[in-house]
Each structure stands twice: as structure tokens, then as C-alpha cells.
């Protein structure tokens, strides 16, 4: 929305959880300025392959969630760095300050809510931590998947626990925080008051365990890994085809009746399979019978057959195939580097803001390390260039 162009976000960020959130805000049209330490910076800048010849801290992994932002380097461990932070918040009229630093660093860096609220009373302050504001335990996505129960639910029953293929606790926490920021912006628009938001990645992760926690704690059921099958519905699984694999998900008894009415699957039209409970009770044999038939069919013909009777089915797409999907390809985001001409292709948001649509789904290229120091500190804050040089030599920026 155009109104998001009036929102300025200052984010002391690194890794994935907070950069993905601010990337979402940049897509909406917010001005996002990422803060990094002038020596260490965001470690994710060094992850993946370097692809811009002769340039450091612009590796491939960093590119995916940092387009549309500006970048400042600032040493908040220095008093002069904290003075600049105060000026940034005040002079740029910052609406949202966000950090995923450990809570023990808040006071040392001068970034605590009370400190920044004193500078701008209506500031919205967001702190993302692994296990809450009282904990300084380091948390990375796989650790959250392990402790948060996701690994216990992922993988084959006879195999080892597995992580899911994307950093779900990271990105899911970002989505939860996004919603909380929208609520805070609305509250501020109505009341004029800012707020403090603390988001725990662990609590975000465990909030998704709706069925597992209820089934375990209320009904004493052991919810565990089941590979590609479903705990409560059958047949639901990946089935082999003559040229690959197909996922079929029969969601209710009516769909199974249509499924078993097909000549190819008529052997499944048994009284004991009429209800889902009977199919679950004999799911191993059921899946073996289905697999014997699907092996003789092409993936395309099987998917076509299932869709014709209202049963959900899909081939197992590669990422390249997903990017070419007609529902995805037109919505991909592009970000072109004006210096080298290199163009990034970025995943689309679930719903594109009108501003993104109006500019042809284009964002500015992910910022280089400290790229906007001069533009922001000199042109907007009025710090003379010779003072900027001194600040750099002193390790402040």
C-alpha cells in the first residue's frame, strides 16, 4: 500500500529471522535501513558463493532476503555510535526499531525499549529472541526444530528425526512478527502510542503444534513420524509412477468412493475401506495396492485422472519447475544491480502490495556493506564528510 512508503524501519539484523521480516516490509514499500557492525557485519553476507567479481560480503545466500533495503555500518558499542543511533531515530522519524540481538546486549548497545522510547515515545520496538527476553540462549533454526518438536514429526517412522527443507521456525517467526507489527501500527494510528513487542522463536514454533499437543495431552495419543503418510487420513502419500512420483491426498470418504470407483482402482472398493478409520487401520496394505497400479501410469496421466474426480494430486516438482509454474513465474520479483547489470530472481510474496505491482515487481538490489553510510549520515543527518572519515578511522562506522 502507498501508505507504507511513509513507514521507516531501522533494523539491527543478521541471519534469517529478522532480515526475512524486514524484506517483507520492504516489499510492502517501507523504507528499511539495516544496521551492521562495521567489522563483523551480518555473517550471512559470507554464506554461499561470491558472485560479484572482486567484491566481498555479497555472497549468494545473503541475496535472497535483503533486496529493497539500505545498509549502514554502525558500532553501537561506542558512545558516538549510540549518539548516531539516537539521531537516526529522531531525524529520520523512525517508526519501527527491530533487533535480533541477545537480550544481554540491549543495555550495552543502547538499544533497549526504554532507551529508544525516551528518544521517540511513539516508537514501535521489536525484539526477536530464541527463547524469550529473559533468555540469552543462542538459537538457530535447526535447534528450534529439534526442541520445538518439528523433528520428532518429520521423517520416516523407522528412520532418524529430520529437519524440514526450509528454515520454518525462522521464517514462521518472521510472519508472526509481521502480524504483530501490523497490529502495533494500527494501535498507534488509533491511540498515538508506541509499544514493545517481544517474539520468541521457540514459542512461535510450538504454536503450530495444534493437533500434536491436543492429541498428546488431552487424548494420550502418541504423535510421531510417519514419512509421507498422514496420521489421520488415508490414502495420503507419495506413490511411484512409471516416470517419477505423485502425491495423492484423499481427504474424505466421498473422495475415496470416487477414487475406488475408477476402473484402475476398483480393487479398493471394499467394505472395510468405506470409512476412513478402516483405511487408517490397514494403511500399509492400502498403500501397497495403490502403488501397484500407479507404477504402471505416467505421473501426468495419474494427476489428470485424480483431478477429474476431485481428488487432490500433484507431481513432485523441483524448484526449477516451481519457478516456471504459471502461478509463480509472472509473480517473481527482480532486483538488478546497477553497477554490474546482474539481475536477481526472488521468490514472490503471498500477496503483492500495490506498490510492488506498480513498479513492475522490482526492488533495489541488496545493499553492499555500508553502502548508504554517506547518503544517510551526511545528506540526511548532516554529518560533514571529514567527520565521517574520522568516524570510519575510529571504527565507529
Locations of regions flagged by a protein language model:
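Conserved Rossmann-fold dehydrogenase catalytic segment
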Residues: 133-134, 159-166, 189-205, 221-231, ...
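Aromatic-enriched alpha-helical interface/lid elements that frame and gate functional surfaces
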Residues: 235-309, 313
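Conserved PLP cofactor-binding pocket of PLP-dependent enzymes
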Residues: 307-330
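Glycine-rich beta-alpha junction loops
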Residues: 39, 130-132, 201-206, 243-245, ...
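N-terminal helix-loop segment corresponding to the beta1-alpha1 unit
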Residues: 1-190, 289, 368, 375-397
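Oxidoreductase and adenylate-handling cofactor-binding alpha/beta cores
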Residues: 174-194, 207, 211-218, 260-267
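Mid-domain beta-loop-alpha active-site segment that forms a flexible
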Residues: 167-182, 201-209, 251, 255
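Flexible, small-/acidic-enriched active-site or ligand-binding loops
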Residues: 2, 337-390
